[in-house]
């Protein structure tokens, strides 16, 4: 009995020391610090989307021979061809299949392109939701310009997805359940893209980089 009573204080002490080990992870930044001003909201919710345009991972990127958008829009035509040099550059028949149009739905690289396009579309939709959640940081002009810029980026990625895959879903929110997602007719997606770009064009800022 005494042993059990003695064990209780030890258990309480051990639990108190364990609570001292609770630390705020240094590799994570609270959302309140990420979105604490108009500038930080732009950097993290708008400008960050441009990082995905020039991505270099396989299956990602709009430019460069990264087995992504550029390759599937160029090496599938007479515009360019990658010849096999002996056993080199065969890569499991990847480039030949592109040129011959003999890819399948199970091809990893083509699947990565689909994932890449919709990753940016979902992130763009999430950015629009984030801007609305923190609209108190912005004046009306900033809010309109931020959202217009994101909508323009998203429309561009919808265009590439429609151009490559035809009937694609148009997402209503970043948290939309997979079971609720439906394909849209290609003509409807095209109209959606045009309407988005026409709506945001007057709201986009005139400033641009020199790159």
Protein language model regions, located:
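Bacterial Sec-dependent N-terminal signal peptides
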Residues: 1-30
């Amino acid at each position: 009995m005494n042993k059990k009573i003695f064990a209780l204080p030890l258990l309480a002490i051990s639990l108190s020391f364990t609570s001292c080990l609770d630390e705020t992870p240094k590799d994570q930044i609270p959302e309140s610090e990420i979105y604490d001003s108009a500038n930080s909201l732009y950097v993290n919710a708008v400008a960050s989307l441009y990082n995905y345009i020039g991505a270099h991972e396989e299956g990602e990127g709009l430019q460069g021979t990264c087995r992504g958008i550029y390759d599937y829009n160029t090496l599938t035509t007479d515009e360019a061809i990658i010849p096999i040099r002996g056993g080199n550059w065969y890569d499991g028949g990847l480039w030949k299949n592109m040129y011959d149009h003999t890819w399948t739905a199970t091809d990893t690289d083509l699947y990565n392109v689909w994932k890449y396009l919709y990753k940016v579309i979902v992130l763009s939709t999430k950015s629009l939701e984030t801007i609305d959640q923190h609209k108190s940081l912005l004046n009306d002009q900033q809010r309109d310009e931020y959202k217009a810029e994101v909508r323009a980026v998203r429309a561009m990625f919808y265009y590439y997805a429609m151009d490559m895959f035809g009937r694609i879903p148009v997402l209503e929110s970043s948290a939309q359940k997979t079971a609720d997602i439906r394909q849209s007719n290609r003509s409807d997606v095209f109209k959606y893209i045009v309407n988005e770009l026409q709506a945001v064009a007057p709201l986009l800022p005139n400033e641009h980089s020199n790159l």
